[in-house]
C-alpha cells in the first residue's frame, strides 16, 4: 500500500486545541468492524458497549515535562525535548538551535533557572546531555520543564495541560506524549465500569517523540518505526488469559496498549502470551494479523500516520476511511485533545489486499 492511500483532507478547525473541562464528555463514534455499521454517542456510552467480564488494557505511563528552554554561553536561545532518561544525570534529547553545538558544549537550562548541562555525545539525530548538578534530572525537569504539547497544538502549555494531558491512572514517568485515548477516562467512569464487572489491567509504554514523526516512504512497508520502551507484566498476561478463557474481549485503550500487547505476543514462543519488557518498534499496518486485541478505544489520528495505518489494520481500510469521513462531516474533534472511537475487530481486515478509492 502507498502512503497516499492514508491521506484525507481535514479542516484545521477540527484539530482540538484545548481539552474539554470534563474528560468523559467527549463524543464517541462506535464502529462495528465486522459489519461496518456506525453509531454515535458520548464516551460514557462505554458502560453499554462493554460487557461484564471484558478486560480493559490501559497504558499507565505518565508524561514528563520534557520541553525545556535554555541559553548558550553566547546568549543564543535553544530548546530541548527530552526523549529518554538514561540515568539520574543523563538524558537523550532532541535539540533545536540556530547552529548544531559541538561535543563538550555547555548550556544553561530553565526559563529563569540556570541549570548547567554539558553535551556529552550524539546518537544519530539525538543528543546526550549531562546535568552538572547534584539533583536528579527527572526531579529538575519537574521544576523547569514544560508539558510537551504535540506539534499540531502550536501554543504554550498552560496550567490545565499539566492535569489534563495526563491520564488519571498514570503512574510511571517516562513519556513525552500522552497515551491520548486514556485521557477520556475519569475516576467516576472507571468506578462505574468496575461496578459493571469490567476488568482492568495496565501495561506501560513510554511514548516517544517519534510518535509524531511523519512516514516519508511512499511504500509504507519500507518505513522504519521508532523504538519505545514497553512492559507487559505477568499480571497483565494472567488477566488476558483469564479474559480469553471466559470468552470475553480484550479491549485495548489506545494504540500504545495495542502495540504493547501485540509485541508481547510476537515475542512469545510456544505459548499464547508471556511477559515482555524492552524496546519495541512494532509497525502495524494493513495485512497484520492481530493476535490479542478484540476491540480498540482510540482517538482520531493524523493523515498518513502510522496510527491510522494501525486502525485500518484493525477495523479494515474501507471501514476506517468511511468512519473518518463521517467524523469530518459531523465535525468530530481530532487528535490528542479530540473525540474518540470504539472499534470492534474486523476479522477480515487482514485479507483486504487492495485499495478502493
From Swiss-Prot:
GO terms for molecular function: S-adenosylmethionine:tRNA ribosyltransferase-isomerase activity. It comes from the Bacteria. Its main location: cytoplasm. Keywords: Cytoplasm, Queuosine biosynthesis, S-adenosyl-L-methionine, Transferase. The keyword Cytoplasm applies. SUPFAM superfamilies: QueA-like. It is found in: Cytoplasm. One of its GO terms (biological process) is tRNA wobble guanine modification. Its EC number is 2.4.99.17. Pathway: tRNA modification; tRNA-queuosine biosynthesis. It is an enzyme of class 2 (transferase). Gene3D superfamilies: QueA-like. One of its GO terms (cellular component) is cytoplasm. It catalyses: 7-aminomethyl-7-carbaguanosine(34) in tRNA + S-adenosyl-L-methionine = epoxyqueuosine(34) in tRNA + adenine + L-methionine + 2 H(+). Transfers and isomerizes the ribose moiety from AdoMet to the 7-aminomethyl group of 7-deazaguanine (preQ1-tRNA) to give epoxyqueuosine (oQ-tRNA). NCBIfam families: PRK00147.1 (NF001140), queA (TIGR00113). Monomer. Belongs to the QueA family. This is S-adenosylmethionine:tRNA ribosyltransferase-isomerase. The gene is queA.
Amino acid at each position: 500500500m502507498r502512503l497516499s492511500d492514508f491521506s484525507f483532507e481535514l479542516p484545521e478547525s477540527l484539530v482540538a486545541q484545548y481539552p474539554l473541562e470534563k474528560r468523559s464528555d467527549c463524543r464517541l463514534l462506535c464502529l462495528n468492524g465486522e459489519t461496518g455499521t456506525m453509531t454515535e454517542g458520548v464516551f460514557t456510552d462505554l458502560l453499554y458497549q462493554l460487557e461484564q467480564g471484558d478486560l480493559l488494557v490501559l497504558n499507565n505511563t505518565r508524561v514528563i515535562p520534557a520541553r525545556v528552554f535554555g541559553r548558550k554561553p553566547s546568549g543564543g536561545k535553544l530548546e530541548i525535548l527530552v526523549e529518554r532518561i538514561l540515568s539520574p544525570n543523563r538524558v537523550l534529547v532532541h535539540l533545536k538551535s540556530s547552529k548544531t553545538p559541538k561535543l563538550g558544549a555547555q548550556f544553561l537550562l530553565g526559563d529563569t533557572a540556570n541549570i548547567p548541562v554539558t553535551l556529552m555525545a550524539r546518537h544519530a539525530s539525538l543528543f546526550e546531555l549531562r546535568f552538572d548538578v547534584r539533583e536528579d534530572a527527572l526531579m529538575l525537569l519537574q521544576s523547569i520543564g514544560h508539558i510537551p504539547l504535540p506539534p499540531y497544538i502550536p501554543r504554550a502549555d498552560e496550567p490545565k495541560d499539566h492535569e489534563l494531558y495526563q491520564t488519571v491512572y498514570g503512574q510511571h514517568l517516562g513519556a513525552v506524549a500522552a497515551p491520548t485515548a486514556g485521557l477520556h477516562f475519569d475516576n467516576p467512569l472507571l468506578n462505574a465500569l468496575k461496578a459493571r464487572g469490567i476488568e482492568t489491567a495496565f501495561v506501560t509504554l513510554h511514548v516517544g517523540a517519534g510518535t509524531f514523526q511523519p512516514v516519508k516512504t511512499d511504500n509504507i512497508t519500507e518505513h522504519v518505526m521508532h523504538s519505545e520502551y514497553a512492559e507487559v507484566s505477568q499480571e497483565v498476561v494472567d488477566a488476558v488469559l483469564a479474559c480469553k478463557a471466559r470468552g470475553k474481549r480484550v479491549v485495548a485503550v489506545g494504540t500504545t496498549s495495542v502495540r504493547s500487547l501485540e509485541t508481547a505476543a510476537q515475542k512469545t514462543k510456544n505459548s499464547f502470551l508471556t511477559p515482555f519488557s524492552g524496546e519495541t518498534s512494532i509497525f502495524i499496518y494493513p495485512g497484520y494479523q492481530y493476535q490479542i486485541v478484540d476491540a480498540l478505544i482510540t482517538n482520531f489520528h493524523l493523515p498518513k500516520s502510522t496510527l491510522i495505518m494501525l486502525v485500518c489494520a484493525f477495523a479494515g481500510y474501507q471501514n476506517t476511511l468511511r468512519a473518518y469521513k463521517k467524523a469530518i462531516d459531523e465535525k468530530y474533534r481530532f487528535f490528542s485533545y479530540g473525540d474518540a472511537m470504539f472499534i470492534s475487530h474486523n476479522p477480515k481486515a487482514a485479507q483486504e489486499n487492495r485499495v478502493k478509492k
